[in-house]
C-alpha cells in the first residue's frame, strides 16, 4: 500500500447489522501485513470491539487499500510538512517510515499536536525516526511536559510560524486529525501563505 492510504473495516453482528469504519494504515510498502492504530471511542460501534475483543487469529472483513489523494511517494522531491492531531498521526507515520526506509532526500517535518504526552501515538518510533532529514515538533494543548519549548495551548499562527516549513519553500502539506483541528490548521496555513492546492487534508469522525 501507499503511505497515507486507508482500509474499510466492516463488522457484522449476529442479527445481520453491519457497521463500516475507515482506518488509516500506519504501514506502507509491499508487505502482506498491514498495521492499524485504533483510538477507542467508548460509545463507538467498531473501535471498542477492535481494541477490547479482537484476538490473534480472529478474522476481520477489510477492503482496501483505498485512496490516491492523501498519499506521499518517494518520487516526490519537494519539502514535505506533516501536521497531525491526535490519532491523525497514523497515515503520517506511514509517510515518515517510508521516507526513512527509502532514504528520500526530500526535507520532511512533522508538527504533532496532542492533549498531553500521554495521549501521543508512536512516541518511540518518532524519536527513532527524527534526524536531520525528518524534524519533529510537538504541540500540547492541555499539559506540556517539563522542558517543552512552548507552553500548552492550541495550535495557532505562532505555532505554524515557529514549527513548520515556511510557504516560501513551497512544501507539500498533509494535515490529518479531527475535523475541527484540520479545518483550523488549514485556515492557519492559508493565512501563512500556503496555496490551498498544496494542502491535502484528511479528517475523521465516527468510531
Q: What spans do the regions from the language model cover?
A:
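Conserved beta-strand elements of the Class I
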Residues: 80-83, 173-174
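Histidine-anchored nucleotide/phosphate-binding helix
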Residues: 89-101
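Ferredoxin-reductase
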Residues: 1-58, 114-116, 140-143
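Reductase modules of NAD(P)H-dependent flavoproteins
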Residues: 107-207
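A short, basic/flexible loop-to-alpha-helix module at the beginning of a structural domain
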Residues: 64-77
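Short, conserved phosphate/pyrophosphate- and ester-handling motifs at nucleotide-, phospho-/glycolipid
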Residues: 4, 88, 178
Amino acid at each position: 500500500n501507499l503511505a497515507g492510504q486507508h482500509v474499510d473495516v466492516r463488522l457484522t453482528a449476529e442479527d445481520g447489522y453491519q457497521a463500516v469504519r475507515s482506518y488509516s494504515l500506519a504501514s506502507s510498502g509491499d508487505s502482506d501485513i498491514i498495521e492499524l492504530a485504533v483510538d477507542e471511542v467508548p460509545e463507538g460501534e467498531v473501535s471498542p470491539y477492535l481494541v477490547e475483543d479482537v484476538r490473534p487469529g480472529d478474522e476481520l472483513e477489510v477492503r482496501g487499500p483505498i485512496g490516491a489523494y492523501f498519499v506521499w511517494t518517494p518520487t516526490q522531491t519537494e519539502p514535505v510538512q506533516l501536521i497531525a492531531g491526535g490519532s491523525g498521526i497514523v497515515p503520517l507515520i506511514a509517510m515518515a517510515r517510508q521516507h526513512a526506509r527509502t532514504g528520500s532526500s526530500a526535507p520532511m517535518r512533522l508538527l504533532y499536536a496532542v492533549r498531553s504526552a500521554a495521549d501521543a501515538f508512536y512516541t518511540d518510533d518518532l524519536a527513532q525516526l527524527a534526524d536531520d532529514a525528518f524534524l519533529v515538533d510537538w504541540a500540547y494543548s492541555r499539559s506540556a511536559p517539563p522542558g517543552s519549548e512552548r507552553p500548552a495551548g492550541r495550535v495557532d499562527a505562532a505555532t505554524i510560524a515557529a514549527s513548520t516549513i515556511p510557504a516560501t519553500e513551497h512544501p507539500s502539506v498533509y494535515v490529518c486529525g479531527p475535523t475541527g483541528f484540520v479545518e483550523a490548521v488549514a485556515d492557519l496555513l492559508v493565512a501563512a501563505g500556503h496555496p490551498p492546492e498544496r494542502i491535502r487534508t484528511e479528517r475523521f469522525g465516527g468510531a
